[in-house]
Amino acid sequence: MKSQFRHVALIGKYQAQGSRSALEDIAHFLGAQGCEVALEEDTARNTGLTQYPTLDAAGIGAQCDLALVVGGDGTMLGIGRLLAQFGVPVVGINQGRLGFITDIGFEHYQNTLAPMLRGEFEEDRRWMMQAKVVRDGHCVFRATAMNDVVVNRGATSGMVELRVEVDGRFVANQRADGLIIASPTGSTAYALSAGGPMLHPSIAGWVLVPIAPHTLSNRPIVLSDSGEVVIEIVAGRDASASFDQQSLATLLHGDRISVRRSEHQMRFLHPKGWSYFDTLRKKLHWNEGVA
C-alpha cells in the first residue's frame, strides 16, 4: 500500500555531521513509498541537495500533507513554531541527543515510518504559547513558543525582581535568577532541570518554575493555560526574555511579558501504540538497574 501522504516536506538539522546522507536516504525512501518530496529552503541550501523542490514554511503549509523533521528537539522547536499555524502534521526522526519530541530513531526509521505513511499512527496535539513584551503600553516584541517562555537575569548581574500576575490578579513578587513558564511539552526541558514537575501532554496547563529563587518557599506551581500570565520587571539589570531558547528580547524596568495560549496547535504523529510514558521511561532511563 502506498503512502496516504502525497506531498512530504523534509526539514533537517543541517549542521550535524552526516545530515546530507541521512536526508538523501530518507528522501529516496519516501519516493519509493509514492511521496513527492520537497526540502525546506534552509535545509536544501545548507546541504546542497538541489534535486528536490524547495519550500519555505508558508510553502510547506500550503502544499504539503506532512512534514518530516530530521534532527533533535531544537530542530523541531524551530520549524514547529512556523508550521503550527498551518495545521501540517509533523513526524520527528531523532538525530539529536535526548529527543522527547523527535521520537523515531534514525537506525530503524524505515520499519517505523512505513506503516505510519499508510495511516497507522497516533496523533498528539500540543497547544502553542503566544507571548508579547509590552513597554509603556506598546507591544515591542511578539513571539510564539512550544516549550517555554523564560525571563532571565543578565549574565553579569544579580537577581531580578519580578512581579507575577495571573488573570490580572497579583500572585507574588519574586527575587530569583529568573522564571520559567513552561507548557506540558516544555515541562521536560529547562523547567525540569530547574525542579519543576512533568505535565502530561493532555493537561491544559502550564508550570511556573522559579530559577534559583532567593526564598526557599518560592516553589513551582501548576496553572491553567486558559488565562494570561504576566511577568513585570521590577528590579535587576540586563534582564531578557527567551522563547524556546531560540529568540530573545532585551527587557527594561517596567516591561511586562504577557503569555497566553495560542490559537494554534502542533500536530505530532507517533508510531501506532506510542505512549507518553514509554517516552519518559526511555529518555529518563527509568527502571534501569532495578532487579
UniProtKB/Swiss-Prot annotation:
What keywords were assigned to this record? ATP-binding, Cytoplasm, Kinase, NAD, NADP, Nucleotide-binding, Transferase
Q: What would be one Pfam family of this protein?
A: NAD_kinase_C
Query: According to its UniProt record, which reaction does this protein catalyse?
Result: NAD(+) + ATP = ADP + NADP(+) + H(+)
Which catalytic residues are annotated?
Answer: 73
Q: Which cofactor does it need?
A: a divalent metal cation
Q: Which GO terms describe its cellular component?
A: cytoplasm
Predominant subcellular localization, coarse grouping: cytoplasm
User: One GO MF term, please?
Assistant: metal ion binding
E.C. number, please?
2.7.1.23
Positions that bind NAD(+): 73-74, 147-148, 175, 177, 188-193, 212, 246
Q: Where in the cell is it found?
A: Cytoplasm
Instruction: Give GO terms for biological process.
Output: NAD metabolic process; NADP biosynthetic process
Give the main EC class: transferase
What job does the chain carry out?
Involved in the regulation of the intracellular balance of NAD and NADP, and is a key enzyme in the biosynthesis of NADP. Catalyzes specifically the phosphorylation on 2'-hydroxyl of the adenosine moiety of NAD to yield NADP.
Q: Which family does it belong to?
A: Belongs to the NAD kinase family.
What is this protein called in UniProt? NAD kinase
Q: What is the lineage of its organism?
A: Bacteria, Pseudomonadati, Pseudomonadota, Betaproteobacteria, Burkholderiales
